[in-house]
Each structure stands twice: as C-alpha cells, then as structure tokens.
From Swiss-Prot:
Residues 840-864, 880-1007 are annotated as: Disordered. Induction: Induced in absence of telomerase TLC1. Residues 383-560 form the Helicase ATP-binding domain. This is Y' element ATP-dependent helicase protein 1 copy 4. The gene is YRF1-4. It comes from Saccharomyces cerevisiae (strain ATCC 204508 / S288c).
Length: 1382
C-alpha cells in the first residue's frame, strides 16, 4: 500500500526536518482557548513552506486513488492508533485513566497536546477527574514517542483526511464534543462534525464514527505477553505503574518532599492523607508558583524516562543551519526530494525483549512440541532474560535442565538483529568442556567456539558463545581482553553494537570446595565483571553457605543477606559501582520444590572383598541385559584408572580419563565416549562426574572410598532418567578420613538422609518416607529402573545357580551368542502358524498329537533338540536301552534353557526305526544309534512349509540311511555325525553333492565360524530390540510405548487393528517369521514375547493414520516404502518420533478424550454454524428420534442395502441382507452384490487390506455390540413413548453397516464436522464407532445418541433436502457409485 502511495515522508527524516528545526517555532500558551480558531493546532504552526514539502504528492494524486485504496489507507491508519495509545501510556509513566487517553486532542477547545519549544518533546495537559475539580497535570513524552505522535498528527492524520474526502460524515454530535464556531449548533451536519473531529482528536475509529473504544484498547492486555501465566487488567496495570513511580524512580524522594508529592499528584492521588509520610497537611500544584509546578512535573517525567531508559539510545543532531529555501531548492533539483532531507544520526534503538522470545528459542532447539519442565524453569528463564538483576545464582538438582536456563536466553539474544551479544561460559574441567560444546552447538542455534580462540585472536564478530574452563577464566590474557573490550570492538567493527552478554559459570561451588585448586582461581578477582550485562552462576550442589563463600572468593559481594525486592536494589548506592558490588540473588529450586534430589536413582551401598571384581561382574550383567547401555566407573587414583582400563579392555570397549592427560586428549576422549555408541564404560577420577550428559547411561559405580557428599551427588546426578548407582567399599575398610580443608567423606548409613542434611531439608529419620531410592526402597523409582533392578537380580540368581565364576562370564557371554544356543520363541499370538529355526545340531519341535517312535514334546514357545551329541554345559536326559525285539519310545519334555537329547540304543539283531509324521510347519529331528549288523532307517514325512533334519550316528560297520520326503516349500537338512571308525552316507540326493543339496542358502552348516558370527549378530540385534521394546513380554500396545496413561489408552485403544489393516504388501510377506518378517535364520524374536514386532508395527501404522487425512496417509505409505517388508526397521523409524507423535495425538485428540473419557456434554445449541445451517440442530430430541425410526422403517420396507445407502444415498435393493440370520450370511450377501468392492474403489477403505471392512462384522467390536444389543429394549420403550408404531430396531450388523457407511461418506463427514463444532476429524473406524455412541443434547435439552443426530443430518443431505451448493456433489457421488457398481 505504501509503495502505491508513492514517496511518503518517513518518520525520522521528518522529525529532523520539522520538529528539530529551530526555524519552526512552537511558542504558545499551554492551554486551549475558549473560542475555536482554525490555527489552534501545532500542525497549523508549521510554516507553509514546510507543509508544502510534507504532503504535496498525496494531495495532488488524491483523485487518482481508487476508492478501495482510499479505504485501505483510512483503515490502516485507524489500526495504528491503539499501539500509539499504549506507547503514550507507558512513556508518561504516571498512569492515565482511559478517558484521559481517549480524549487527547491536538486542536480545538479541548486541546491538550502541545510541543515544548525548548526540548521539542510532546507535552500533555489533562484534567480528567471523577468530580472534575482537579487542576491539569503536565506529562512529558520521551523523544522517540514524541516523534511518533508528531508524525501521526502532521502526516498520517492528514493522509487519512485526504483519503476520507470531503463527503465523509460518519460522526454524529455526541456530548463529549465541544462543537464551536457555528451560530446554530442544531444546523450542524454530520459532515461538519466529522471534519471537526478529524482535525481535533487523535484516537479515532473512522469506520465506526467514534473514539477508540475501551474494548479495542484492552485487547492488547488480553493477548500480550503471549506466554504470561496471568495477565493484568487496566486497573491493576495502573496500580503497578504507580508503585513503580513511587518506589523505583529517583533516589531523592526522602530529601525532597515536593518531588515525592508531585509524583503522587501526577498519578491522580491526593496527598492530603499523606501527612505522616510527607510531613505536610495538604499539597497541590496550585500551592506553588506556576513555573515551579511546571518544573516539578517536568522533572518527574524526566526521572521516569531516565529510569526506564527510554532515551538511552536516542541521540539526534538538530538541523538548525538549514532553512526552508535550502530544502525547497533541493526539492526542485531532484524528484526524489526525500533523499535531500537531513537524516537523523542516532544509534539504533535496542530491539525490545519479550517473554515470547524464550518460547520461540525453545521451539528452535527442541521442536514445535517444546514445553518447559515446570513453572520454576519457566520463571528462571524469564528472570535471566528479562529482569534487570545483574547477578543470579541458581541451585537445581542434577539432571534438572540447568543448561537450558541460559541456553534459551542465549538463543533469544542471538535472534536480536540490532545488537550482537557475545557471551562466555566456563566449566570446571576439560572433560565437561567437550560435552558442553556438543550440546550447545546442536541445531545450529548458536555459534559456539572455544574461549582459547577469543584469548588468542580476539572477538571474531560471528561467535555467540565462547566456552572455556576455570583456568581460562583466571588467565591474565582473558581479563585483559575484557578490560579492553570497548576499544577493541570500536576499532575492529567500527560500531558499538557488539556488546558483552552473559558471563556464565557452571558448577561454581568448586571455587569453594576445590581446595587444592584455589590458588589457580586467584586471577578471577581481577576480572571486570561490570563489563558484562549479567552474571549467571549455576550448580547442583551449592547451598547458601557454599554459594556465598564461592562468590566472595572470586571477588563478588556474595549472596543477598536478606530478601531484597527490586525497589531496594535499584535505590542501593552500591549499584552505581557495578555488578561486582551488587549482591547476587539466589534461586534455590531444591528448597522451593522440597523434594530430595536423586530420588529417581536406585542407590546401593555394598561391602565386597574385591571392588574391581564386583564392578566387572555388575558391568557384564548390565551389558547382557542392556547391550546398548553405558556406564561410568569412578576410581580413587589415576593408577587405578589405568589398571582397570587395561584389565577390562578384553570384555568391552572402555575410555579412561584422569587429570594427568593433556587438555586436548581429555576433550577427544570425552567426545568419543559421548558420540560413539560402541563405547561402553568411561573410567576416571571424580572429574568424570560433573556436568556430563550421556543419554544411554544406566549405571554409575564408585570405587573411591573417600567421596564427599558433593562428589556423590554429582556422580549419581549423571543418571538423568534413572538407573543404578553402586558404592563399593572393601569390607571393614570404609575410611572416614578427611582430606585437609575439604568436606568430610560420606558416612555409612542412609544416603538420602545425608543428602537432606546437606541441602538443609527437613529430616525424616525414623519417619515414613525416609528412604528415597536407597536402602532397598523402590517406591519413588520409575518403572524402567525397577524393571532393570529385577532383571539384574534374576540374572544374578541364574549365575549363582550355574556356579559361574566372574572369570568365566565373558566366554559364556560370547558363547551365548553362538548358533548352538537354544531357540525358544518363534511364533506370535496373532498367527496360528509356527516359525521354524534350524540350528547346527538338528533340533526338534513337535506339535501335540504327533505319532513318533522317538518322540520329543516341548512346551509352548520352547525349542527342543533330540540328538546324540551334547555340547558343553548342556544336560542330556531321556536315554532308553531296549532288549531284543523290543519297541522303543524316547519321550522328553525340556524346560527353559535346557538342551535335550533323546537317544535309543538297540542290541544285536534288533531293528530300530524312528519314524515321525509332523503337522504343519513343524521341525523334526530323528536320531538313531545302532550296533553291529543292525539296519537303521530314519524316515520323516512332512507337510507344507516344514523343516526336517535327520541325524544319524553309526558305529563300526554300521549302515545308515537317512531319507526325507518333503512336500511343497519344505526345507530339508540331512546331517551325519560320525564316531570313531564309522562311515556314513547321505542319500538325500544320490547324484548331488552337499553344496547343491542345501535348501537354505543362508546357513552353511559346514562353515562353523560363519554360522557362529551370524548367530552372534542376530543375538545382539535381538538384545537391542528387547532393550528398546522391553514391554512386549506383556499384553502391551503401541500407545503404552508412546507413554499414554491407562485411562487414555482405554478410549484411544486401537482394537480391530490386525494384519488386514495394512495395505497389501505392507508387513504381509509370506514364508518368513510371522513375528518379525525376517528369514528364520535371522529371526530377532525372543523367548516369552507375547506381542510381536509385526503387531507393534501394525499399531504404529494405525497411530500414523490417526494423525493424517486420506491424501496425507497415502503419501505417508509411499514415504515408508523401504519398510514395507521390514516391520522391525519401521518400528525403529517410528520410535525416533516418539515424543513428537505423543504430543501431536494429545493436541489433535484432546476434544475426543474430553468427550469419550471425561464425558463432556455435546449440546447442539453450542454450535452456531449448526443452528444457522441445519434444521436438525433446531429439532427436539423427540423429533430426531422419530426421524431416525422413520428412516429405518423405510429402509426395512424397501429392503435397501444399508451400507451403500449411507455411503452415497444409493437405494439399491438387497433382500438377502435383511433376511440373513447370522453375520456370515450377512457378509456373504454384501459380498455378492459387490458392496465391499465398491467401497474399496470409491473411498479410503482402499488404503487398508481387502478383508479389513469385511472382518469388522466378525470379531472386532464385541464390547460395542454388547452395549448396543442391551439398548434395544430402550429403543422399544422410546418408540412406545413417542406414540409411533413400534418397528424393529436394526439388528447389530445393519447398525454397524450404517456407521461404516457414514464413516466412509466424505460429503456427510465434512458436513457433520462443519455443523457440530465440538467434534473434529477422526480417521480410524474404531474411534468413529465410539464417537457415534456418545450422547448429545438436542435443542430441547433432551439426550439422544449421536448416531441418531448423524442419521438426521444424513437424511437432510438427501437429494430432496440438500442445501444450496451441495446437490451437485451428491449427484456426482451417486453417479460415480452407480458406474462402479454397474
């Protein structure tokens, strides 16, 4: 719009040209006169030669402007009035009541806006009072606000007058107007009044023809600040401004009573009651001379402007040397006259801060679902970013998120384009430095560099945050750089807009507790703290006494000794000396929350014979349970660190760090451990316990028997999300020796009680709740931590049973990865099929009722092996020896983790046969051992998809035949193991060799090393998945995995989701494991798994469907095409977005849970669109029910196919549907007429499997069906009550057909969601069915089921009753459906 208007003069050049020009005089009386004069406005005081420069273009081009553009100009200027009112309200400081603001006038008899000729600031004289008896108050605006007001009156209002034109007449004569200059006021027209108003009053709504209303003005208070938990009303804001003016502005109130009294009067407060405070009986501005009253009020305004800093960045140069002729000459010399006007040379005003900046920063860093941990974290971020407190100390428990307290404000500062802020962060150790660099530079929100770069090269103008250690902070080079900051910046960047931001010191308690390093900290006292905008000190272990001593040790004043409010701090004389003399304000979140830290970690104190041996045992157990986890081990000495690293290196990958390493090496090793997923254990001295954030960390082991309470808390605090902490000490050797000058070591006993004592929390010794995560208490631990403890305990019991020593553990740990390990689980609850996994030693799984001479029976999900050869540590049982002509049966039942061998030995001249016939998908192994001259035959007949292994061991001169007959798709292995001097033959294929006869090319039974390596990889992957999805041993679903509560899952539960929900080709491959869709040799399912990965993948896909409409879901299926045959890979892909998906469901389905879970009532009268756009929403409950029964009566009489009718109003006949007696016949009738085929081709049902809709009529909705059938009697009573002829209410299958048809009817869905404003879109059929059965309040406040309202809306959309604009859509749907059907 402004481009269309052409060269409109801008604010700052115009202020310099007119308002700052000493040739323009503004000397005039400061009050309006009784008679209206045309020039009674400071606009009229501007010489004509200057006014001609301001608006000639707009006036000349007025006739060329279209009516639309003129209206756009007028409306745009109206929108600027409210922000200008707020600018004035805050700029004057001493608050107005709203009528004072509303009636500001720059001309006419009510004029109260003037320009002070000396200061060239706008001055306001107002005299509003409830009784009208007060004298005028004079308030002066700051320079910038004066520029805006002056520009608004002299430029924007004149533009608005030109745009509205001479015919504008929106204003009527109101009592607040003082219409003068007319002989007969009754003859004044609206056009005359409108012209007077436009040339007099500032804040108008020209569209409505009135002054700006209070409702419009207060809208800003309701909206801003956006993320404030509670907003002030106008009255509260007035009182707040008064309090600020009374307590904060100026420091001479105590010595100058007139100054104090003037401040009260300017806030419209009477001083007569302030006798005891001010020492005067009464005071008014009329009691002093006129000039004194003016000076008192001007000084009060000046104090406010200085205190608020409104002119701290405001510097103007007056163009007093230029005259009008020069300007006019410039105009004639160039068409671009605005380029010749003198410019204002001022420093760019500082971009204002907002509390919303922190929220924006959080979303940049963590994504759109970002939320603060709690209100304490939100308040502290705002305190650090917004408040003027120059020095802040924070104590929060380890793992609370202290880094975000300064990280988010730093990102917010970096977003300000007017000033470049350079901040510094210092940490105690180099180890922590590497971790901080990684965390703070993520997402690219901040430019982060080592502080060494700054010390050596100076500020580069790009870096937002320099990170260093305490040694850098104390270095002379750093303090010298800070001392010379202003000169360096001015010389390097030629600007003063590069400023020092925050000085942040993490874990600052070390200044006091690290006695041996205190000599190194001496240089910090030389640092110029006053150069920084703010100093922030953070720690998880700094109670008030420690914090105060630490701050004083580096040269600061220390903590505030008493609770001081901002008013006292502002008036403190010490403030003038800078930050170093300012007391630091302490925020102790641990005391505020009254929660003992570290309650989420299970802390175990154990006395053992050998600390390293016990630690190794714990670590190996952890990595067997959680292969991807990490651990930290804290040792006493540097020698012990290196010894442990050398001895443990053969078991897992370790990283070791101690103080004797160089800084670069420490950084490199820490970064390697944090970023490399294969690194398992970090071994070091206590320097590895502070500040490091490792996501996979699950265990901390402390071998140092001299740890003090701070070191203990810091070490345990590394376990952010819970885990195990072991304190290992030698028996009878726990020493309570105190190192000189340091805190004493922790004592034997309750750890939690010692933590409470350290933080100054209330002791609970001997009371309920004393033990929190210690002394065997598990009450406060998370479910994951409790499960980890139980799994560790179970593993310890098994190891004790097997009598394994710690030295043998690694080999058995590796051995368990081999392909010889028994396979115990392969099937899933969803499928009746059994998966088959062959191993090297011919294992057997036989189903019930199989007939076998050598029979092995295994329990559910247990693998059984019948073989003659047993490996080490495997028990062999069930051995039978028969005499001549005997019949042999060897039957074995194997329990968990036991290998079973069934062996039969026959005597001379005995013929033994082992014949097995198995059922579908069985795995059979038949083993026979014969003596001399015996004849042995092992024959197996298998059915489809079977896996058969026949193994024979023959003694000297024996003859062995292993024959296998397999049907289609069978997999056969014939293996012979020879004893001494034995010979064997394989006759599976007489003319072929072993390489050609393998049916499974993946497994090479002759390559043992290859087999072992492959099996180890599979086992490792299996353990990873088990750790990632641990609850699949229970009847869990994907909503539990996402983190929903049980009451939410109850209503969001994804019932009816099975393999048929997935489109063809998605997780539906055959011939593979039914649980994970991998080849049998690569199966990653594990023993005891009740919910397969494939089922989880189905449900995960359903969750994604919940969040997407049809088009988005179709695109999503294309996006995940690489995972169509890999449900395990898809689950990993899905779990990456776990938090985001959870938040999105919470947002999108909040209304759904409110209706279904909390049973919030839906009232049709609350839907404005419904009442206006549908007759149904004005019907009573009785009328809706009558209409519902009538629709079903008509459908029954005409034998109309229900699903097709509700899908697109097609009235095809289907008599078989109405005559069907059971669900099977009903579905067959629908399938016969092609309903399901049309549904898939026309609607989003095509995005599911071909059987999905059909199976809805069989087994998925039992609970809903039961509820519906129980309600049939109620429907009969309703019909009798309504006086209608009782008709049969639709049976369940017809009712379900109706709801399915409505669900896939896109036109109806869009209409219903538009009319019924309380509901939104649902994309899963189960959710739609649940929603349809909630109750709504009709227009007469009677309750009816929502499905009855749906049928009424559907009927209204029928061709005879379709609203305007919808008939063509219905016809199109009908035509397309008939075409498909025919």
């Amino acid at each position: 719009m402004w481009k269309t208007l052409g060269r409109v003069e801008q604010l700052l050049p115009y202020a310099s040209l007119i308002l700052r020009n000493r040739e323009v005089l503004f000397r005039e009386p400061k009050r309006g006169i009784d008679e209206y004069l045309e020039n009674d406005s400071f606009f009229q005081m501007i010489p004509v030669k200057y006014r001609e420069i301001v608006l000639p273009k707009l006036r000349r081009d007025t006739n060329k402007m279209t009516a639309a553009l003129k209206n756009k100009v007028a409306v745009a200027i109206d929108e600027l009035t409210v922000p200008l009112m707020w600018m004035i309200h805050f700029a004057v400081g001493y608050p107005y009541r709203y009528p004072e603001l509303q009636l500001l006038a720059f001309a006419g008899p009510q004029r109260n806006v003037y320009v002070d000729d000396t200061t060239r600031r706008i001055q306001l004289y107002t005299d509003y009072n409830k009784n009208g008896s007060s004298e005028p108050r004079l308030k002066t605006l700051d320079g910038l606000t004066s520029d805006y007001v002056f520009y608004f009156v002299t430029v924007l209002r004149q533009m608005q007058i030109c745009a509205l034109g001479n015919s504008y007449d929106a204003f009527n004569h109101d009592p607040w107007m003082d219409v003068v200059g007319f002989e007969d006021p009754d003859q004044v027209t609206n056009r005359d009044i409108s012209r007077i108003v436009l040339y007099s009053y500032m804040f108008l709504n020209t569209a409505k023809g009135c002054l700006v209303e209070y409702a419009t003005f207060r809208q800003y208070m309701r909206e801003l600040p956006k993320n404030a938990p509670q907003k002030l009303n106008f009255r509260e804001m007035r009182q707040g401004l008064i309090a600020l003016g009374r307590h904060c502005v100026g420091s001479r109130f105590e010595t100058d009573l007139y100054e104090s009294a003037t401040s009260e009067l300017m806030a419209n407060h009477s001083v007569q009651t302030g006798r005891n405070i001010y020492g005067v009986d009464s005071f008014s501005l009329t009691s002093v001379s006129g000039t004194t009253a003016t000076l008192l009020q001007e000084r009060a305004s000046e104090r406010w402007i200085q205190w608020l800093g409104l002119e701290s960045d405001y510097h103007c140069s007056f163009s007093s040397t230029r005259n009008a002729e020069d300007v006019v000459a410039g105009e004639a010399a160039s068409s671009d006259h605005h380029q010749k006007i003198s410019r204002v040379t001022r420093k760019r005003p500082r971009e204002p801060k907002s509390t919303n900046d922190i929220l924006v920063a959080g979303r940049k860093l963590f994504g759109s679902s970002f939320e603060f941990r709690d209100l304490h974290q939100l308040r502290l971020c705002h305190e650090i970013y917004m408040a003027d407190t120059p020095s802040v100390a924070v104590q929060a428990p380890p793992g609370y998120g202290k880094t975000e307290l300064f990280h988010l404000p730093l990102i917010a500062l970096a977003s300000k384009g007017d000033v470049k802020y350079v901040s510094f962060l210092f940490v105690p150790y180099t180890v922590l430095l590497a971790n901080c660099m990684i965390r703070l530079s993520r997402c690219g929100c901040l430019n982060v560099a080592p502080v060494r770069n700054f010390i050596e090269e100076g500020c580069d103008g790009v870096t937002d945050l320099y990170v260093g250690i305490y040694d850098d902070l104390a270095s002379t080079n750093f303090t010298d750089r800070i001392a010379a900051w202003e000169n360096i910046v001015e010389c390097t960047f030629r600007t003063n807009n590069v400023k020092l931001g925050y000085l942040i010191v993490d874990e600052f308690h070390n200044f006091e507790t690290e006695v041996y390093r205190q000599s190194q900290f001496g240089g910090i006292t030389n640092l110029d703290f006053d150069a920084f905008e703010k100093a922030i000190f953070l720690s998880g272990t700094a109670p008030e006494a420690v914090a105060d001593a630490a701050l004083q040790r580096i040269g600061l004043t220390g903590l505030a000794k008493k609770s001081m409010d901002i008013n006292e701090l502002k008036r403190s004389e010490d403030l003038s000396r800078g930050l170093s003399s300012y007391p630091t304000r302490m925020f102790n979140l641990i005391k505020e929350k009254s929660e003992v830290p570290l309650g989420h970690v299970h802390k175990i104190w154990k006395k053992v014979e050998s600390q390293p041996e016990e630690a190794l045992k714990l670590l190996l157990a952890l990595f067997e349970i959680e292969p991807e986890s990490k651990a930290i081990v804290v040792a006493s000495t540097t020698n012990e660190v290196e010894e442990l690293a050398c001895s443990w290196r053969k078991y897992f990958r370790v990283v070791w760090i101690h103080g004797k390493l160089g800084a670069a090496e420490k950084v490199s090793r820490t970064k390697e451990f944090v970023t490399d997923g294969s690194m398992r254990v970090l071994i070091g001295t206590k320097l590895v316990t502070e500040g490091i954030d490792i996501k996979q960390l699950m265990m901390v082991i402390m071998l140092d028997n001299r740890l003090n309470i701070i070191e203990l808390i810091q070490g345990v605090g590394r376990l952010r999300d819970g885990g195990l902490c072991y304190l290992l000490s030698r028996k009878n050797s726990w020493a309570a020796r105190n190192r000189k000058g340091e805190l004493p070591p922790i004592k034997e006993g309750c750890i939690t009680e010692q933590v409470r004592e350290f933080y100054g929390l209330e002791s609970k010794k001997g009371k309920k709740g004393q033990h929190v995560g210690c002394c065997g208490s598990r009450t406060d631990l998370s479910a994951d931590t409790v499960e980890l403890i139980e799994r560790m305990d179970r593993l310890a019991e098994k190891q004790a049973t097997a009598s394994m020593s710690i030295i043998a553990l690694p080999s058995s740990f590796q051995e368990s990865n081999s392909s010889d390990r028994c396979r115990k689980y392969c099937s899933s609850d969803e499928d009746s099929d059994t998966c088959i996994h062959g191993s090297a030693n011919a294992s057997t799984n036989a189903t019930t009722n199989s007939s076998t001479n050598a029979t092995t029976t295994a329990s559910t999900n247990v693998r059984t092996s019948a073989t003659t050869t047993a490996s080490i540590n495997v028990r062999t049982s069930a051995i039978t020896t028969e005499s001549t002509n005997s019949s042999t049966n060897a039957t074995t039942t194997a329990s968990t983790n036991v290998r079973t061998s069934a062996t039969t030995t026959a005597s001379i001249n005995v013929r033994t046969s082992a014949t097995t016939t198995e059922s579908t998908n069985s795995n059979t192994s038949a083993t026979t051992t014969e003596s001399t001259d015996s004849n042995t035959s092992a024959t197996t007949t298998e059915s489809t998809d079977s896996n058969t292994s026949a193994t024979t061991t023959a003694s000297t001169n024996s003859s062995t035949n292993a024959t296998t007959t397999a049907s289609t798709n069978s997999s056969t292995n014939a293996t012979t193991t020879e004893s001494t001097n034995a010979s064997a033959k394989e006759d599976a294929n007489k003319d072929g060799n072993a390489e050609d006869n393998r049916f499974h090319p993946v497994t090479d039974i002759n390559k043992e090393s290859y087999k072992r390596k492959g099996s180890q990889m599979v086992l490792l992957e299996r353990k990873k998945l088990k750790a990632q999805f641990p609850n699949t041993s229970e009847n869990m679903n994907v909503l539990q995995f996402l983190g929903f509560r049980s009451d939410e899952i109850k209503h969001l539960f994804l019932y009816g989701i099975d393999v048929y929900f997935c489109p063809e080709g998605v997780f539906t491959q055959y011939g593979l494991c039914k649980g994970c869709q991998k080849m049998f040799e690569l199966c990653v399912c594990w023993a005891g798994q009740k919910v397969s990965y494939r089922r989880m993948a189905w449900e995960a896909l359903a969750v994604e469907r919940m969040l997407r409409n049809d088009e988005e879901y179709k695109e999503y299926l294309e996006d995940i095409e690489p995972y169509h045959g890999d449900p395990v890979g898809y689950l990993k892909y899905f779990s990456v977005k776990r938090g985001e998906i959870y938040s999105q469901i919470q947002r999108n389905y909040a209304w759904y849970l409110a209706i279904t879970r909390r049973r919030e009532t839906i009232s049709v009268l609350d839907s404005t669109r419904g009442k206006q756009g549908s007759q149904v929403f004005r019907m009573s409950g009785r009328q809706i029910k009558e209409l519902y029964y009538k629709v079903w009566s008509n459908l029954r009489e005409s034998k109309t196919e229900v699903l097709q009718y509700f899908l697109n109003w097609d009235e095809k006949k289907c008599r078989e549907e109405w005559e069907a007696k059971d669900d099977t016949v009903f579905v067959e009738a629908l399938e016969k007429v092609g309903v399901f085929q049309r549904l898939r081709s026309m609607t989003s049902a095509g995005l599911q499997g071909p059987q999905y809709v059909k199976l809805q009529f069989s087994r998925h909705h039992r609970q809903l069906r039961s509820r519906y059938e129980l309600s049939l009697g109620m429907h009969l009573r309703d019909q009798l009550a309504l006086g209608v002829t009782p008709s049969k209410v639709p049976h369940w299958t017809a009712f379900l057909s109706m709801l399915i048809g409505l669900f896939y009817n896109k036109t109806f869905r869009q209409k219903l969601e538009y009319l019924l404003e309380q509901i939104s879109e649902v994309w899963l059929l189960p959710h739609w069915l649940d929603l349809a059965n909630v109750e709504v309040l009709a227009a007469d406040n009677t309750r009816v089921p929502l499905y009855m309202l749906m049928v009424a809306v559907h009927k209204e959309l029928d061709s005879d009753d379709v609203p305007d604009g919808r008939f063509d859509i219905i016809l199109l749907c009908r035509d397309s459906s008939r075409e498909v059907g025919e």
